[in-house]
Amino acid sequence: MRISKNSHKRQRTRLYFLVTFIIYSIIPCRAVLVPWLDDDPFEATLLEMGDEPWSKDILSSTPPLHPSEVTEDNKSLKQRGNVPQYVIDNSPLLHLYSEEKYWPADVKDFVKRFQLRDHSGEKIINEHLRDLSDLQEYYSVELENGTWGRVSSEGTYMTSLDDFDKGPDWLLGEQPEYGTGHIKKAPAVLFVVDKGNGWVDAFWFYFYPFNWGPYIMGSGPWGNHVGDWEHSLVRFYKGEPQYLWMSAHGGGSAYKFEAIEKIKRLRRVDGKLTNEVIKKPLIFSARGTHAHYASVGQHAHDVPFFFMPLSDFTDRGPLWDPSLNYYAYTVTVGEKMTPCGAEETKMGLEWLSFKGAWGDKQLRPRDPRQKWCPFQWKYIDGPKGPLFKNMERVSLCQRFKWWNFWKGCPARRYIKRGEGLDAEKNDLVGDNCGILLYNIRPKWLRSILRFLTWRGSVCFIMDYFTG
């Protein structure tokens, strides 16, 4: 059957009007053509939150600098060895998982459980580690010819004195105090890094003795390792918080600071409570892996949208306030690191330069404790320490996936919502399909597009580029 030219023309006309309708339903000036499309029941709430999703990013006008480029003329920190009050006021609070097994710990106590060995299992020093001072960048070792040489700590491993597979008590860590969120025996580690031009980065590091990996289809856990460093970054401009980045499995997520959920707390100045009420940002720490997320629920582990069986889980478990107990350092002009207190001075700086792994080497395949699945080993290498987490970065992101060749790191404007039964349903929380969906009117059209793009590649593209 032949189709007339008029029929083709009518089809093109219909397609044109449909595309035009969708476009003008999305762009900010859509109400000029169709006034009722701008009826937004959440508009007042968004204005209350101070969200301006289409405003110019301050990063592009006055960018932060690499620490090596910071000088006396453009520095942001006025005093070395002093933590600004705004860093404490805007420090993250962490909801640890309600059924967590492995809680935070103190690095000073942790190191006493280890010997230091190289990749072949040979001892670097004969005795076990006594304290942090035994962690160094270089070691003097006796060579086979009887002479002494200097070797790097690169490729060394803190090797457990106990069999970690049997779950010794020191792997369990310490739980936060109910009500205050204080953990007496688990200080966080804070680095306040001057990025010049008014920018300051506050890196909060959280240490756990053990990483309990995820399950796959009921089998596991996989990817376990002794020692676990997680961290968050709050980026300030002229004393005001602008962004928050949170780590998860070697990657992480960046958010506009105003997008993050916050809770009210009494302000502390010099460690003492005041009557002033402030709002602090919330991070949700996943069960076992301690990966960070901005919402409650099930989160696909490293594989966005497409492989939910490998997942992290978060909820509103015990609240930890790292600002109540921490070791602190500042990094200022000349990339000089300065301890911020007597305890940090006593600990020294050498332990931070240790290039080895904060935990055991991956068990060999023939070790009876080791298991393998198509995706992962049961036990893998321990992590590197804080100075190897790219704190000098100008981008918000610590690193980039192989496919991200343009090295983009957009800050999300809406919280990315978790999946599953525990996820909290809220139209002000992103639904993994990007904020463009929130600008589509009428609601029936938005519902159709939500359905069509659910968990598909379109979702991933929208989510990445629109936040």
Curated annotation (Swiss-Prot):
Keywords: Glycoprotein, Membrane, Protein transport, Transmembrane, Transmembrane helix, Transport. Signal peptide: none annotated. InterPro entries: VPS_Associated. This is Vacuolar protein sorting-associated protein 62. Glycans are attached at N74, N145. It is a single-pass membrane protein. Its main location: membrane. It comes from the Eukaryota. The gene is VPS62. The chain crosses the membrane at residues 17-37. Involved in vacuolar protein sorting. GO terms for cellular component: endoplasmic reticulum; fungal-type vacuole membrane. It is found in: Membrane. Belongs to the VPS62 family. PANTHER family: PTHR48220, VACUOLAR PROTEIN SORTING-ASSOCIATED PROTEIN 62-RELATED.
